[in-house]
Amino acid sequence: MLRKLFLMVCAIAIPLRGLAPLQKALYITTEPPIKPYEALWRAVSMVESSGDSLAYNVSERATGIVQIRPILLRDYNARTGSRLRLSQMYNPKISKRVFLYYATKFHYSDYERIAKKWNGSGYKTEIYWKKIKKQLQKQVKIN
C-alpha cells in the first residue's frame, strides 16, 4: 500500500518537475506610476511655448516651457518656502514642479479649471481652454 502511494506520488510529481522553474527566484515587477496631470502638462507646454523650454516672453517676463511669470514664482516660493529663481524656469523639471504644485493644490480634479487658472482670469481663459482642449485631443489621437 505504501509502495503504491509512493509510486502514485512519483507518477504525478515527475512530469510536473519539467514545468517548475530551475532557479528558485521571486520576480517582483512594478507598474509605472500614475501621472494624472501628464497630458495636461504636455498640452499647456505646447500652448504656452510650443514645447520650447527656452521660451521667453519679454513683455511679461514669462519664462520657460509653461511661461512662468515672476509674480507666480514669488507666490510659489512664499507658499512652499522654496527659493527658486526665474532663470531656473528654463529647466522643464523645475517648471513642472511649480506647475504641478498649483494643479494639485487648487483644482486637482478638473483640467479646465486648472488650465484657466494657470492662464489668468477673464474671458480670454475660454479661448485658452479651447487651445488646451485641442492639444489634449491631439494626444488622445496619437496615444
Give the predicted meaning of each segment.
Residues 1-36, 143:
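N-terminal secretory targeting signals
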Residues 27, 47, 66-72, 139-143:
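Cell-wall glycan
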Residues 30-33, 58-61, 88, 92:
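Alpha-helix initiation/capping motif
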Residues 34-38, 59, 109:
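Extracellular/periplasmic catalytic domains that process cell-envelope and extracellular macromolecules
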Residues 35-52, 68, 99, 113-121:
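Short, functionally critical alpha-helical segments immediately adjacent to catalytic or ligand/cofactor-binding
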Residues 42-58, 81-90:
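Short charge-dense sequence patches
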Residues 53-81:
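N-terminal, post-signal-peptide region of Sec/Tat-exported proteins
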Residues 70-139:
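Alpha-helical segment that forms one wall of the substrate-binding/catalytic cleft
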